[in-house]
Amino acid sequence: MISNQDNIIQVSAPGKIILFGEHAVVLEKTAIASALSLRTTVTFTPNTNNTLLLDFPDLAGFGVREWSLDEFKKLDHFPNDIDILKPIECSELFQQELNKIIDIKGIHTFLFLFCALTKCTKAYNIKITSDLPIGAGLGSSASFCVSICAGLLKAFDTYICGGCKQCIGGQGQQQQICNEQLNLINLWSLQGEKIMHGTPSGIDNAVATFGKALTFTRKNGYKILENGIPPLRILITNTRVSRSTKTLVEGVIQRSKLYPTLIDPVSNLIDTISSQCIESFNQYHTDKDYEKLQQTMDLMFDMNQHLLSGCYGVGHSSIDTIVSITKSLGFHTKLTGAGGGGCVITLLKQDTTIDQLSNLKLTLSSNGFESWEATIGDPGVSINILPIQK
């Protein structure tokens, strides 16, 4: 068998949206997150220069950088003694060492994962591209981390399963990944997320790894919806309004503490919306069921949006504007994630035409918003092995 170190490895992982339950999840309720058709793609090509070349065109001001592998090996606290099958956090001391090389958190994450998973024993040219806007709450960093981890583990034939038949495949085809290996990818990507976000929930990297959709509670963690969800069409719109997730979350918690008799019923209702959503997904079997599902989802979008904005107080005038525009054109919209700006999602109809979609996007654009069409319920991380052309 040809080693994967002699091949080009191309990996992609999806972004994510929160369908229902945002903010209620911090009050011990259920959130539903789904994988997006918008993905990050990472291509690993071996080189003979004893260097790590990173091409990251989507990261503003980064471009292409190249380092000698020896430069990393000489760093104090280099993660040489890490057991790859037992993911651990990047030490604060090694982060300080990486900061001497480059002062960008996202690149610290990449370099830690590269050093930990390869020990800098093989040189690569690595190119990262993404459909996902950075910093918009769509899981771009988790998609990035999962793609990096999956690719490096594959490149070095590192399998927690010992290399089961499911994980070993030939060239030119999409590789299968067993659940044990997916769990390893997920845990390593979480360590990368910690560098960028401190104490991430783990939702984003789980969605990017396993795909489809999952439920999440603070008490029980995440649970994958094994039946998946229907491939609903959505339009994601970026308000271009930055916000502090921490401040918004703290505001909801404060309201809950001050007015529990008012906020608790709201949280319970949002939890019921999540449950109704799952029940509707389970009742969907063919395209004939789409219209009924659409009606339910339209109602759930409207109700959840009103509760988030009016009762939790995480709305914003930009969100209200988008809700109003889309409603005038016959669509239903809710915020996704933290609110206070960020992104919103609009449910498209199964028969929404190209002209209708173009008109919707043009109207939003003329009001200063940027939007992307996507589907939800997409597959998780995928790996393709390609031979090097000689």
Swiss-Prot record:
Q: Name one GO biological process term.
A: sterol biosynthetic process
The molecular function GO annotations come to: ATP binding; magnesium ion binding; mevalonate kinase activity
Protein localization: Cytoplasm
Residues binding ATP, per UniProt: 16, 130, 135-141
Gene3D superfamilies associated with the record? 3.30.230.10, GHMP kinase, C-terminal domain
Where is this protein chiefly located? cytoplasm
Q: In which pathway does it act?
A: Isoprenoid biosynthesis; isopentenyl diphosphate biosynthesis via mevalonate pathway; isopentenyl diphosphate from (R)-mevalonate: step 1/3
Report the EC code(s) recorded for this entry: 2.7.1.36
Q: Which domain of life is it from?
A: Eukaryota
Residues annotated for Mg(2+) binding in this entry: 141, 193
Q: What GO cellular-component annotations does this UniProt entry give?
A: cytosol
- Provide the reaction this enzyme catalyses: (R)-mevalonate + ATP = (R)-5-phosphomevalonate + ADP + H(+)
Q: What cofactor does this protein call for?
A: Mg(2+)
Q: Which UniProt keywords apply?
A: ATP-binding, Cytoplasm, Kinase, Lipid biosynthesis, Lipid metabolism, Magnesium, Metal-binding, Nucleotide-binding, Steroid biosynthesis, Steroid metabolism, Sterol biosynthesis, Sterol metabolism, Transferase
Keyword Transferase present in the record's keywords: the answer is: yes
Q: Which residues form the active site?
A: 204 (proton acceptor)
Family that this chain belongs to? Belongs to the GHMP kinase family. Mevalonate kinase subfamily.
Q: What does this protein do?
A: Catalyzes the phosphorylation of mevalonate to mevalonate 5-phosphate, a key step in isoprenoid biosynthesis.
User: Protein name, please?
Assistant: Mevalonate kinase
What is the organism lineage in this UniProt record?
Eukaryota, Amoebozoa, Evosea, Eumycetozoa, Dictyostelia
